[in-house]
Amino acid sequence: MAITKEEVISFIENMSVLELANLVKELEEKFGVSAAAPVAVAAAGPAAGPAEAAEEKTEFDVILKSAGANKIAVIKVVRALTSLGLKEAKDLVDGAPQPVKTGISKEEAADAQKQLVEAGAEVEVK
């Protein structure tokens, strides 16, 4: 009972943008690749990538672990940080743990974490 390519494509077509973004991120982590890298850089990237990451991390991800008791305030902060619509922000908060922002600077990640924690959320910066 193998899954066909058509079934996979049909499943992906029915995913929301947030679900699809999470799928891409999980695939990038599982296979150690980046969907945003140009082909020329991707060929040289795996050899240089881990060494650079060990030196100093420059890109951070803000992960919403839970909304806490004040979910409405957390949704408002998520909307302000991400420019998502109300439904998308609510889906993101309801689906925690979820990445709120990815690939951002250390300062921006700290600011986002501060805002979310002040709203009552449990947040992790990776």
Curated annotation (Swiss-Prot):
<keyword id="KW-0687">Ribonucleoprotein</keyword>
<protein>
    <recommendedName>
        <fullName>Large ribosomal subunit protein bL12</fullName>
    </recommendedName>
</protein>
<dbReference type="InterPro" id="IPR014719">
    <property type="entry name" value="Ribosomal_bL12_C/ClpS-like"/>
</dbReference>
<dbReference type="InterPro" id="IPR013823">
    <property type="entry name" value="Ribosomal_bL12_C"/>
</dbReference>
<dbReference type="GO" id="GO:0006412">
    <property type="term" value="P:translation"/>
</dbReference>
<keyword id="KW-0689">Ribosomal protein</keyword>
<dbReference type="GO" id="GO:0003735">
    <property type="term" value="F:structural constituent of ribosome"/>
</dbReference>
<comment type="subunit">
    <text>Homodimer. Part of the ribosomal stalk of the 50S ribosomal subunit. Forms a multimeric L10(L12)X complex, where L10 forms an elongated spine to which 2 to 4 L12 dimers bind in a sequential fashion. Binds GTP-bound translation factors.</text>
</comment>
<dbReference type="InterPro" id="IPR000206">
    <property type="entry name" value="Ribosomal_bL12"/>
</dbReference>
<dbReference type="InterPro" id="IPR036235">
    <property type="entry name" value="Ribosomal_bL12_oligo_N_sf"/>
</dbReference>
<dbReference type="InterPro" id="IPR008932">
    <property type="entry name" value="Ribosomal_bL12_oligo"/>
</dbReference>
<dbReference type="GO" id="GO:0022625">
    <property type="term" value="C:cytosolic large ribosomal subunit"/>
</dbReference>
<dbReference type="Pfam" id="PF00542">
    <property type="entry name" value="Ribosomal_L12"/>
</dbReference>
<dbReference type="GO" id="GO:0003729">
    <property type="term" value="F:mRNA binding"/>
</dbReference>
<comment type="similarity">
    <text>Belongs to the bacterial ribosomal protein bL12 family.</text>
</comment>
<dbReference type="Pfam" id="PF16320">
    <property type="entry name" value="Ribosomal_L12_N"/>
</dbReference>
<comment type="function">
    <text>Forms part of the ribosomal stalk which helps the ribosome interact with GTP-bound translation factors. Is thus essential for accurate translation.</text>
</comment>
